[in-house]
Amino acid sequence: MKNTQLPAHSRVVKAHGAGNSFVVATDQYDDYDPSEVEVATLCSPAFGIGADGFIRAVERDGLWFMDYRNADGSKAEMCGNGVRVFVDHLRREGLVDLPVGQTLDVATRGGIKRVTPESEDEGQGASYRVDMGPAASPARETIEVRVPGIDAVLGGIWVDMPNPHTVVELADEETLRGVFLPPVDVSQIPQAQRPFYDPAPQAGTNLELVVDLTEPGAERGHIAMRVLERGVGETQACGTGCCAAALATALRRGPGAPTQWVVDIPGGRVIVGLDGVIDWSGESPRITDASVFLTGPATRVAEIRLP
């Protein structure tokens, strides 16, 4: 039976990707399976280190596996900002030899993700490009969403990255700034303060609130986004959410929409690539098997020795 707690005096790392923060632990030989309680405690800013999620680095069958947990301890399919932090951790710890421009395959619950370092750390984190794999979406608004503080019923586009996302477009940045998003999982707040979905996603959903800032004729799209993460609350960034938000905004724009998107989140900026992801040739758009790409920073904050 595996240990459910980190051994005494274990060393962990605090790191972030565009403000999306993580506690990272190396468990190369797969000796440790953390309980939900331990993960939630480590991620608690009051009782632990404080983070949006927990990452365990495990080597299995010649591949590095990113065991990602939400801040409440629940297991998640993937984390786009987390996978950059994960590979940055492997490089800094000397667990892989991965020069700039070379690619590493990373195993996740959401499949293999290919990660390429694009630059070294120059004070604001090293930059990594992630092949996030294909998205899945009905490519239209299929969910009605009510957001506390906004009177209107909003249309949501469902995107699977492969974790679930519902993307809602707002009118302007003032509205985006004024929305209340809780800093904790919605299960911990009154029903009246929670977003409402119809139909309600069975496995829950991340909620992305987006404003399209794209200038007329611009080659790159530009959006501002806030995110309410499933099992966490509002975070400074969400990599898979940025991908979902860019894709949904492109779908709303229609044929001729940009395929490169700048995404501004509270924690910084990332770039999403959608080349070949949307097929506009039919009567309605279709999501192809082409990969979505995510580029952004990974920054180490601290090395911590547990008691």
Locations of regions flagged by a protein language model:
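Active-site proximal loop and beta-alpha junction motif in alpha/beta enzyme cores
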Residues: 1-78, 83-237, 246-307
